[in-house]
Amino acid sequence: MKILVLGGSGMLGHKLVQQLSGDFDVWTTIRGEVERLANFGIFERERTIEQVDVEDSDTLTRVIESVAPNVIFNAIGVVKQVPTAKNAAATIALNSLLPHQLAYLAERVGARLITISTDCVFDGTRGMTTEADHPNATDLYGKSKHLGEVVEGNALTLRTSIIGRELGTRHSLVEWFLSNRGKTVKGFTNAIYSGFPTFIFAEIVADLIKNHAELRGLYHVSSDAINKYDLLLLLRKYYGVEIEVERFDEFKIDRSLDSTKFREVTKFKPRSWEEMIAIMASDPTPYDSFSR
């Protein structure tokens, strides 16, 4: 089975390429040059299509038609931690419009589309939201991701949240935390999270491709909830870094997702957070060797 991962150099994309390559014929697109990422040993040159601008519809169409994949995985998006997230045009183009364009192109080549949404479609005032709850985000990022949810045709949209290592950037929680060696950071005891490390989420995606080819529509995919303070303590423990984590109780937000529907259909049972962080920290990928 041929898989096309769009956005292969991103935090999720590169883990999908790593995890899926053992079982599938995996192709990927990246915005830059593959030579810049050669030290990681992740990308096969002949299956990596470099310098792809997905906002160029002609280029995107040519890539999909030439690869002719069975499954297209959309790992492209503007995340809220980057400056581009303040640019409404760029955010809407990638988070809202691109998934629908991909759904159209997937239908044309007879492929299944898997795309990722976020727990941030909810404002965080109430946790354990289900697929039946109406998204109520108030910020551009959350609204743009909601608009990009594709629930018709051959598309599967997974609402979730991810943490993980990055290839040369420091936008997200794990890289931020590891960059604070020898310092003190705040751990939010009332910030509730139910996502996954990218390594684990890639395992979930592999299972969906292998064993649940019929799954379509919108599903919440979540772990058992943890607060950010306890999460940082686990990161400190398994990465073996000297960082003081200070309890901070005042900030309150709960974007935990109820994934009962997904678990019933797929028989999915999440690993414990202790196990997931231990697995993530043991990843041999040489992230720290990258010239930032």
Question: For each predicted feature, which ranges?
Answer:
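N-terminal Rossmann-fold cofactor-binding loop
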Residues: T28-N39, D53-V54
